[in-house]
Regions:
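Short loop/turn motifs that recur once per blade in beta-propeller domains
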Residues: 26-39, 85-94, 143-151, 196-206, ...
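Catalytic lobes of large eukaryotic enzymes
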Residues: 193, 212, 239-262, 274-287, ...
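Beta-propeller blade signature
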Residues: 67-80, 124-138, 177-191, 232-252, ...
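Sequence/structural signature of beta-propeller modules
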Residues: 1-29, 33
């Protein structure tokens, strides 16, 4: 591919779409297919079962960046992956968002995300909304006159029959613009509505934050943005504030409330961490991330994390550290057990440190897939 083709993303996406439609003429299901390694995908608990749905993402091999548009279902009981494809479905993307609804036999709603040339010299941000019918195994593109601007790195949460979207960023290649607008999509009426906010009482512009739904509203934590100061080098900021979006079916009554930091919050601050909802405990579970510190004026040092934190959602919110425990020894009268023998230390079985991974809690089990760990 020459340089002109490399920069013409519209032509590249049109080529991908034509090749995909030619190859996938009908809805297909494939078994025994494991997703390739990737980051910035979505891992979504099925709203009507025990399964998990993995969609999209990207992989950078050091020279080229590849984007995916495949949809996978993970079945925990069988430890099995299945992939689903159809002629009509969203284009390749990463840093999109997906939420689930139990309506209509189960639905997966996807908005936005990004696609880039293989050398990452040019970027395309999506502003399309798609819904996947789990029962029918089909995608539908939802067309609306009013909709959020194109973006990636935003977050969405499902509250009752509303999809709530906040923030994200747009990267032109020369500069990254971070967003702080709030939108609500009504899945009954198929309409987007922007919620106007008080600039002094809302979260600052950001991407890559956590956004968890509760019966009363939505909790926002952390995220990342860049600080531009004239004459100085751009500075990346890992945010550590928490907010609560008080929801109401009367959308004019929605408002933000800032929360104080209580308990054992992640320290030091980090970006690229992921928080999943543990509904049975009314808690968010946060994993991993990366902390960047300046080694000197020319270089940065990155520390990657694989620790777990819990954020208790009710009330004003409280952080707790989730330490791994050693498994209990099994008692068996017919076995001679050496009391001096140590059970396996759980620290030796922790996932590798990483950021931008995909995590989800389903039936009291935490699942972690993919992410990025840098060396050298």
């Amino acid at each position: 591919m020459d340089e002109v083709q490399e920069e013409d993303l519209d032509a590249l996406l049109a080529q991908y779409r034509a090749e995909w439609e030619e190859k996938h003429t009908s809805t297909e299901e494939h078994t025994n297919i494991i997703p390739s390694r990737r980051a910035n995908a979505t891992l979504t608990p099925c709203p009507l079962g025990n399964d998990l749905w993995l969609y999209g993402g990207e992989y950078f091999d050091g020279e080229r960046c590849l984007f995916y548009q495949d949809l996978f279902r993970y079945i925990p009981e069988k430890n099995e992956w299945r992939s689903y494809s159809s002629k009509i479905q969203p284009g390749p993307r990463s840093a999109h968002q997906m939420v689930a609804s139990p309506a209509g036999g189960g639905q997966l709603w996807c908005f936005g995300g990004e696609f880039a040339s293989t050398k990452q010299t040019n970027f395309h941000h999506y502003r399309d909304l798609w819904v996947y019918s789990i029962a029918e195994r089909t995608w539908e593109k939802v067309e609306t006159k009013v909709r959020p601007n194109a973006r990636s790195g935003h977050r969405m949460a499902m509250w009752k029959h509303f999809i709530v979207l906040f923030g994200g960023f747009v990267d032109t290649g020369a500069r990254t613009t971070y967003l702080q607008d709030l939108w609500v999509f009504d899945t009954y009426e198929y309409k987007w509505k922007e919620i106007k906010q008080n600039d002094l009482r809302r979260p600052s512009a950001r991407s890559g934050f956590s956004f968890l739904s509760t019966p009363e509203g939505i909790v926002l934590y952390g995220g990342y943005c860049k600080k531009y100061v004239k004459g100085q080098r751009t500075q990346g900021l890992a945010l550590e504030d928490a907010w609560f979006l008080q929801m109401d079916e009367d959308l004019s009554k929605i408002e933000w409330v800032k929360r104080k930091k209580i308990g054992y919050a992640p320290n030091p601050p980090r970006s690229g961490c992921t928080m999943a909802l543990w509904a049975n405990r009314n808690m968010g579970v946060l994993f991993g991330g990366v902390t960047d510190t300046e080694a000197d004026e020319e270089s940065m040092e990155s520390t990657f994390w694989n620790d777990l934190y819990g954020y208790q959602l009710p009330g004003t919110g409280r952080w707790i550290s989730l330490n791994m425990r050693k498994p209990k020894k099994k008692k068996n009268a017919e076995m001679n057990v050496d009391d001096d023998q140590e059970t396996e230390d759980p620290a030796t079985k922790l996932p590798l440190e990483r950021y931008n991974s995909m995590i989800a809690v389903q039936r009291n089990t935490l699942y972690i897939y993919g992410g990025i760990y840098e060396t050298g």
